[in-house]
Amino acid sequence: VTLAKTITISNSHNYGDMEVKAVNSGGSAYCGGIVGYANKAITITSSSSNGAFTVGKDVTIKDNLYFGAMVSMTGTTFTTTDCSSTNNAQGKGFTTSASVSQFYPGWVGKGATTQVTHTIKNCWNDTDFTATTDFSAGSSCYMTLGISDAVSGAKCSYNIENFTASGDLNFYGNANALFYAGSIFGYWRGSGTMKITNCISTGTHTYDATFKGRTTIAGLVGYKSSKPGITFTTCENASDI
């Protein structure tokens, strides 16, 4: 299945929730979520919402639908620029769900040899900013927001620049899988980077990775031979980091 190549949202404002939404269900085929199996990029520019700002909510897989998701296994970029929200941003454009039936931005499928980059620039949120990655079922698929494939050495990067939150700034990676569960920055031979630059929060900055299941993964930076880089530059807050 090959769907759209590019999705662009520019100069948009919504007084309620703002959602870019796609639902895929049923069948036994490769399905690619919002931008398809062979997509190029998603760009959200100068957009704001007085409610929640969510991209990729309820992108659901059922009955042997594999890979794809919002960025596919072919490599692409996901960029959110000049965006704002007056509600909890839930990762500023990244949906959060504990259900394995959800596809997330950046899912790199098993066997992929891809590079995926997420960039969030010039964004603010007047409550908490939370980027949460949950994986909670037995599966040989992997988590998101910089998860690299466990076999092929895929590389994913996650960049946050010039971000302001008037609440907490949280980054969590949680896995409760019965099989391979990655970490925020890569797994096994995979590698990736995370750069957090000029981020301000009046609450707590939290970077955490918790893993429960058959395979225990150690900490924020991945497992085994992954060599991710984590960079914090000019970040400040009014509480702990």
Regions found by a protein language model. Name each.
Residues 1-241:
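Surface-exposed loop/turn motifs in large extracellular/passenger domains
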